[in-house]
Amino acid sequence: MDIPRPETGPETHEHRLKRMRMRSWRRGTKEMDLILGPYADTRLGGMDAAALDLFDALLDENDQDLYRWVSGQAAPPDRFAALIAELAR
């Protein structure tokens, strides 16, 4: 017997914020947990859609690359430069 599954529609704004907050705190390295987690806790709620899209894209990046960008060991891609500078403060 097939069990009916609820239809899933577009992600709600609230769910998106929760998902992004979780991804910020549950990274592959503790260093990035401690950098991205507090940032997400304090900033996500005030971001517009474009800023959320950019931060969401940043969360898809490799932790080792992110750490090198935030610590100044490597230059970030241009699209992330301002966000990385804000994270590094």
What is each PLM-predicted segment?
Residues 2-89:
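Positively charged, polar, low-complexity stretches
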